[in-house]
Amino acid sequence: MTLDDLFSMRGTAAGQTNIRNLKAMQISIASPESIREWSYGEVKKPETINYRTFKPERDGLFCAKIFGPVKDYECNCGKYKRMKHRGIVCEKCGVEVIASKVRRERMGHIELAAPVAHIWFLKTLPSKIGTLLDMTMADLEKVLYFDSYIVLDPGSTSLAKLQVISEDQYLQIIDHYGEDALVVGMGAEAIRSLLEELNLEALRAELREESQSTRSQTKKKKLTKRLKIVEAFLESDNKPEWMVMEVVPVIPPELRPLVPLDGGRFATSDLNDLYRRVINRNNRLKRLMELGAPDIIIRNEKRMLQESVDALFDNGRRGRAITGTNGRPLKSLSDMIKGKQGRFRQNLLGKRVDYSGRSVIVVGPKLKLHQCGLPKKMALELFKPFIYSKLEERGLASTIKSAKKMVEREELVVWDILEEVVREYPILLNRAPTLHRLGIQAFEPLLVEGKAIQLHPLVCAAYNADFDGDQMAVHVPLSVEAQIECRVLMMSTNNILSPANGTPVIVPSQDIVLGLYYMTVERSFEKGEGMAFCAPWEVVAAYDAGSISLHARIKVRMPDGRLLNTTPGRIMVGEVLPEGVHFDLVNTVLTKKNIARLVGNAYRDAGTKATVLLCDRLKDIGYEFATRAGVTIGVKDMTIPQSKKGILADSQAEVDNIERQYRDGIITRTEKYNKVVDVWTKATQDISQEMIKEISYDVMRDEKTGKEELNQSFNPIFMMSNSGARGNQDQMRQLAGMRGLMAKPSGEIIETPITSCFREGLSVLQYFTSTHGARKGLADTALKTANSGYLTRRLVDVVQDVIISEHDCGTVDGLEVGHLIKGGDIKMRLAERVLGRVTLYPVTDPETTEVLFPANTLIDENVAKKLDEAGINSLHIRSALTCRSDRGVCAMCYGRDLARGHVVNIGETVGIIAAQSIGEPGTQLTMRTFHIGGTASREIERSNIQAQYTGRAVLYRVKSVRNKDGQHMVMGKSGQVGIVDEQGREREKYVLPSGAKLHVEEGQEVKKGQLLAEWDPFNEPFVSEVDGLVKFTDIIEGKTVQEKADEATQMTTQTIIEYRTTNFRPAVALCDADGVVKTRPESNIPASYSLPVGAILMVRDGQEITAGDIIARKPRESSKTKDIVGGLPRVAELFEVRKPKDMAVVSQIDGIVTFAGETKGKRKLVVTPETGDEKEYLVPKGKHITVTDGDFVEAGEMLTEGHPELHDILGVKGEKYLANYLVEEIQDVYRFQGVGIDDKHIEVIVRQMLKKVTVLDPGQTSFLVGEQVDKAEFRIENQKAIEEGRTPATAEPLVLGITQASLTTSSFISAASFQETTKVLTEASLRGKNDHLRGLKENVIVGRLIPAGTGYREYVHSDISVPEQKERPDRFLEELVGAPQPVVED
């Protein structure tokens, strides 16, 4: 099975250039005729070469007559030599006189003595031959491997056609009916004749009819599967019998070489061994047949032939793999193309590159941003050809050979020429692992002594490089086009913003930040305080003269006329600002965040060129003043707070108290654990705050007046951490505060914290406790790097063909976006969320209703600011999810190109950028788990809600009861409380947990900071809604409830336990005096409360209680530390649409929940809507139900704890909701780690997951029921049907995991190079699939330019005229860095 097209192009001169004009590539099953056509002769002997003459044996596997001469233009016997005899066939040895490279393309063949089934079509599940003949795999194998007979024609017997019978059964039937009563067959011949007999047209009609008439779903599925294969054969030109081979092709000998080693031995490709076995067995079979050997011997030989061909095509697929001399399985044809070492991934997608070198990197603090230091030795080697041609051109060398000698001798003139060649010649620097496109950037080389590459310090963040021994690779772009691309697109100066989130990636770090921070800090009572200056230059002069200190507080008249309070240091930083950048941005303490803001603003306000110059100047002054400051760390700098002892003593007392309560049985073990952990977390935070307070301020005294003032501290550790140069508060805390709680390997938090810090030193026990965290960190790093890399690979594969294909798709659909609110706090404002997007509808002012912005406006910083000022809370934006482009996405739906700041260009590969943006931090995060040393960090549990705004309280769906203290207790989980301002706009909204005490009423005026509600963060209470007598049902000692007496406390608590039998339902009912169960207020639901496993009873049977009393409480889960390690698998789980481990039950309709007993050991919940049928849900025993009896739930709401399954969300809430849910959940994981990724990247990937639909009813189209079809294809087909007056098909949306989506892509080349290569190729060849080469991968594989960026069809087919230029202008870089992109003329 080979690619016909490639063979038709073979050998022609046009064949070499033809690849550019390929329209599509087709794969199909090769017919015996076509295999013979490709072949140049039959291989009859298993011999390879003659061991004495080393010449190929005639008719053997390396035969020169079949495959071509071994030496260029020389026949085997040596009669004809040299070019003049080209094309002659030697009459003596039969070899054509031609170039020996034909041995790479000429094929041979083996004529098989008996047909053989192709293992791919037999064993790739589901078996193609089996499905077509409607036979099981086991039966098929029995027949093919000569174990049983198959009935070809039952004749007069009672057997059915295609029935498989054993040898014994066959003999019995012959005894009974006689020899000629039936026709049976065995082996591939029988199967071949059956396949030949098939009438596919009739079979199709029959299957379609049967599929429509049947009721059984399983049968329908089976029929559809068979129908698909039948249709595939009918639509392609393939014939079923070609799945059984009569001829085996032999690949060209140069592709399975035989290489002589020293000592007269040979190394050979495994394929030669496999071919040899096939030929040997084939020849033996021919001989046995000619001799008329007994049937059983021939059968055995045929079986062995089948097995040897199987091994040749796919060794190890069936039975044991054939091994070579050293016991290693031989590599078959399938293994050659499969996996990381296979043809696709090793040789076609990843090639080694010429003109490249690698070396260690060192920092180059003196370089400009567009430069890198290249060692002279490397440059000499990389630019050799250029030097040769220059030497020849100058007349310094007469031939290339003499030029070569000059270069080898390293003559002086060579170095001058090298300087000239290298000047302004862009080169590429790459650091592995290249996780995003900023891992390869272009620089101009400066020749340097030594052997290390010098790297500009500001690009280290993009490369994630440091100088502890990292290596980088250098590549030289050769063609003019490549050089222009490097210059205009890849130059480090053109990659200032990160493609992931649009923030600057070229930002000073470490020393530079420290230097700038030091410059801009102000101090009291410094030399020159209070002086006033008439202009910035005067300040610099005064500082240089030594009459003022760097940190003195002074007044300066600025060029715009304002008199500003500032310091000399800030004025000096202000001097390097480009025009258009406000001095106010540096008239503050420059921390890393502020510097990033400065660079971002400079980029927007002053342009690329100015920003580049600014960054370089900041780097220079930053280094200079970091050196002048001379900041170092000493042990004394780690000041331990005075109050540490007190805080520890108080906490210990509190913990002792909790222990006492636990012993007295007031609280349970889980509660004790939670409370203790909370106490220590709080203690750690308190000590940490105290330490920071003490370390972050110095008290300055004025010697003259004795006045004292607080100043920001000059403590080196504090300066490093506060400026963002190195370290964080967490690490400072561990140095000088306390290390805090640690986690066990299982993720649980150990109750005893490490109270010492590193300055005090750890005891042996404390040191031992902290080893857990350290080891976990290292283990995680090793394991997760691989996971993250694999996630990136899958992401890239699913979106590799998403390209910006048009300017506007004209959709009227989009997404509604509002503020991002978590737990009532606005985590991200609307303006931030919609930045860089395009509005879908005109935006109107909520108060005046005037139109602020028309539809299709790109929201840039200015528009976003206006949105914020107008108080707009939500608006509709366009999104990749709703884009209607058939291929790729349109520019308007995508919005801004984050790395460039304007609307995205047509031809941009937004898919790959999205995949890289999501995959890159994955690796970063996994590598950074251990930075906190496994110290358990955990937020103190929230236990109340305070108003963030002043306004009026509004209650939504709140059910509450008044308890005896007159407080409102919230019932159920569906309640929310919100605040509305005077205009009636909702400002905030919070979910109220069950059992919360509510402090406000509907419509009450609320001040900012007022307490709205509070609750117990460790327990979930079950509150009684009515007064009455307690009556226990199914609460039976030892069966459903256990009196847990603590060994430590001797106190007993009654806890509901896991119960084995199914018919128990522990509950507490409230009755009147006669024992009749009361009903809940405002409903007729009985006041009976079912209790989950783990609930602790707070009342006794028969006790009298009032409304609002707590019947029982369930401790909330003890907290485990969250790591991104929990995060990466979560991201993968979402992208792969896997069933979550803790799957939640989701309601599919709106309605009221009622608890309806148990069935099969599961609790039954019924949701009753206002109209229509009710729905039942079964909940497993241990699962905690999050709704209470009588709650109102919306469709899509979770009834139990856990994560909902994505298919459920899609079914209930639809595509948009699902897409939104996915984006939010994935963003949660990344935000938790402080990683910023723009939503649009995740949307692009989710778009690919949702690009298919499942056909429900094919109508009068060519689709089949249950078929998965591309949305675009489905739309087009339906449109056609409607135009022609046929019934269109109906379908439902489908969500696929990224691996599945990659494998079902329309390009078989791309899918095959991803995973499951043999399966993909088998399916594709069966369908005779065309690959239209639209994605990036398939084009790289066939060796063309990718259809994106400068290779996009609109750019490639246009003529660009460039005026002649003799000399390259000196300031080529300056021109280009600030220059716009080249204009393309059509």
UniProtKB/Swiss-Prot annotation:
CDD domains: RNAP_beta'_C, RNAP_beta'_N
One function term, GO molecular function aspect: DNA binding
A cellular component annotation (GO) from this entry: DNA-directed RNA polymerase complex
Keywords carried by this UniProt record: DNA-directed RNA polymerase, Magnesium, Metal-binding, Nucleotidyltransferase, Transcription, Transferase, Zinc
Sites where the protein binds Zn(2+) 1: 75, 77, 90, 93
Keyword Glycoprotein: no
Cited Pfam families: RNA_pol_Rpb1_1 (PF04997), RNA_pol_Rpb1_2 (PF00623), RNA_pol_Rpb1_3 (PF04983), RNA_pol_Rpb1_4 (PF05000), RNA_pol_Rpb1_5 (PF04998)
EC number annotated for this UniProt entry: 2.7.7.6
Cofactor details (free text): Binds 1 Mg(2+) ion per subunit.
Catalytic activity as recorded in UniProt: RNA(n) + a ribonucleoside 5'-triphosphate = RNA(n+1) + diphosphate
GO biological process, one term: DNA-templated transcription
Binding site residues for Zn(2+) 2: 809, 883, 890, 893
Cofactor list: Mg(2+); Zn(2+)
This protein's record includes keyword Nucleotide-binding: no
Binding site for Mg(2+): 466, 468, 470
Annotated NCBIfam families: rpoC_TIGR
Family: Belongs to the RNA polymerase beta' chain family.
Oligomer status and interactors: The RNAP catalytic core consists of 2 alpha, 1 beta, 1 beta' and 1 omega subunit. When a sigma factor is associated with the core the holoenzyme is formed, which can initiate transcription.
Protein role: DNA-dependent RNA polymerase catalyzes the transcription of DNA into RNA using the four ribonucleoside triphosphates as substrates.
Entry protein name: DNA-directed RNA polymerase subunit beta'
Gene: rpoC
